[in-house]
Amino acid sequence: MTDRADLSTDVLVIGGGPAGAAAGYWLARHGVDVTIVERKTFPRDKTCGDGLTPRAVHQLGEMGLTEQLSKYHRYHGLRATGMGRELELQWPSHSVYPSHGYVVRRRELDQMVAENAVAAGATLLTGHEALDPVIDRGFVRGATVQTKDGTTKQITARYVVVADGANSRFGRALGTFRTREWPYGTAIRTYWETPRHADPWIESALDVKDRNGNPMPGYGWIFPVGDGTVNIGVGLLSTFRDFKSVNTTHLLDAYAHQVADRWEIDPT
């Protein structure tokens, strides 16, 4: 079904995640008519460790979000663990960047940045998926978008920013692609309740093992969220010979059992 109520804007941003929403914010702040289209609706979740580095904290502060960020759990650095040893690496002092980060769940962070773009004057269309580019004399001048009810319309623009992620359908329509021979990673995470939810360090383990105790070419993480839970996850590289046979859910379970006593979680 086609709806002919087409739209026009100066800049069309494909993707309303932190990158797209930040682009929309700065464009709107400078008086540009900008429209952001996002396939999902907020709040929506993403697989992520939820950790914001000092550079990210600085950039979000430049966007006026310092007060909102201060409500979340602050951490001071990274604890690296492996082979029975650990090393606490505090964020260094810097003339521009703070010496702390925050842990913010993505379902909250992404909505915060998107709403901030709207407050700056950007138009945000959620539940709108960009299907195909609008091409005019060899230039990308917008997109055909589809809403959840199946209606489609064209949004034309002078400029288009493609920010819909690594698996960009819109990008593929423009001819971009991922070289299959290149390495890539996959990750899985969940949240566990623990009294250590406000630990001042995020943690990364360099000695993740599978259920049989075999070392794996990846890493594990534990990021305290400060709300009674920690974000626990594992990441794995495709360079591993048996990568495709690995069950990441089982790997996460093995890692949770590996850290259960120290982090006071119940992985059962």
Task: Put a short name on every predicted segment.
Residues T41-M63:
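Conserved N-terminal glycine-rich FAD pyrophosphate-binding loop of Rossmann-like flavoproteins
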Residues N116-R262:
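Predominantly flavin-linked oxidoreductase catalytic cores and closely associated redox partners
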Residues R262-T268:
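A glycine-rich dinucleotide-binding beta-alpha-beta segment and adjacent secondary-structure elements
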Residues A28-C48:
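Glycine-rich FAD pyrophosphate-binding loop
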Residues A19, F42, N167:
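Conserved Rossmann-like nucleotide-cofactor binding loop
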Residues V57, G61-Q111:
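A conserved beta-strand/loop capping segment in the N-terminal third of enzymes
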Residues D3-A19:
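Beta1/beta-strand and adjacent pyrophosphate-binding region of the FAD-binding site
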Residues V32, L65, A122:
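Short phosphate-binding/catalytic loops that engage adenosine nucleotides
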